[in-house]
């Protein structure tokens, strides 16, 4: 997301979390220090630095090198999960997961988010995987990794910008209370992470066929 919209959205999400009675803790690495609970100034610094190319993109693989260099870094889903789990944070929200890229049979391009979901005990609330990915293969790989994907108020997994992917949700939760029970049981059994897949509002969503045409045209 371009600056300054990235900063505006991050602060708006924090405000929404507070309004719901929870405590937000935006995660990143600032001057080599992994930080769970960035200040508004630190969010501004990382948001602006991303546009300037001075902020590193950090998955699990990249965090130690960023710390050693005392550099700034914005965490991917996998990086955020790692730091959240280390701090005892059990739930985080993001737009969408990384997963299996289109053409992965040749490129082997699969996001580090998938193995991290199997490893770190964090519930990731999102609109499933990003639309540019191969969504059926992503769903299949998550199944192989033993990662539950819970459709929140839907029997069909969302597709980031779209409420519909054509992929059946492996399990569903009708409301937050039901989702919380699934999360609690999963963590009690020490089974790693899981995904709570929340579709975008239908009035704001985009038809998946339109998204696919745009992606195919760009590839």
PLM region spans:
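Active-site glycine-rich loop that binds ribose-phosphate moieties when present
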Residues: 76-77, 105-118, 122-143, 175-181
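General beta-strand structural signal in soluble alpha/beta enzymes
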Residues: 24-29, 73-76, 91-96, 102, ...
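Glycine-rich beta-alpha junction loops
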Residues: 31-33, 98, 153-158, 198-204
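A glycine- and small-aliphatic-rich helix-loop capping segment at beta-alpha/alpha-beta transitions
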Residues: 3-11, 42-48, 98-118, 141
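A C-terminal functional module that forms or caps the active site or interfaces directly
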Residues: 195-197, 201-219
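Anionic-ligand binding region
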Residues: 163-187
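Active-site cofactor/substrate anionic-group-binding motifs, chiefly glycine-
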Residues: 2-78
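Solvent-exposed alpha-helices and their adjacent loops that cap or buttress functional pockets
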Residues: 18-19, 82-86, 91-93, 109, ...
């Amino acid at each position: 997301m371009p600056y300054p919209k990235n900063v505006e959205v991050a602060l708006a999400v924090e405000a929404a979390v507070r309004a719901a009675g929870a405590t937000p803790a935006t995660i990143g690495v600032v001057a080599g220090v992994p930080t769970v609970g960035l200040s508004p100034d630190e969010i501004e610094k990382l948001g602006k630095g991303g546009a300037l190319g001075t902020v590193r993109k950090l998955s699990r693989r990249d965090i130690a090198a960023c710390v050693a260099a005392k550099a700034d870094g914005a965490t991917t889903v996998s990086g955020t999960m790692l730091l959240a789990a280390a701090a005892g944070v059990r739930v985080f929200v993001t737009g969408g997961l990384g997963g299996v890229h289109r053409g992965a049979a040749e490129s082997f391009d699969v996001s580090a988010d998938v193995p991290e979901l199997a490893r770190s005990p964090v519930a990731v609330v999102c609109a499933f995987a990003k639309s540019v990915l191969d969504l059926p293969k992503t769903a299949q790989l998550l199944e192989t990794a033993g990662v539950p994907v819970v459709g929140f108020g839907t029997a069909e997994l969302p597709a980031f910008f779209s409420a519909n992917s054509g992929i059946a949700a492996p399990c569903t939760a009708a409301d937050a209370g039901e989702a919380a029970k699934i999360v609690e049981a999963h963590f009690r059994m020490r089974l790693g992470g899981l995904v709570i897949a929340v579709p975008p509002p239908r009035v704001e969503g985009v038809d998946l066929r339109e998204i696919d045409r745009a992606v195919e045209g760009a590839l």
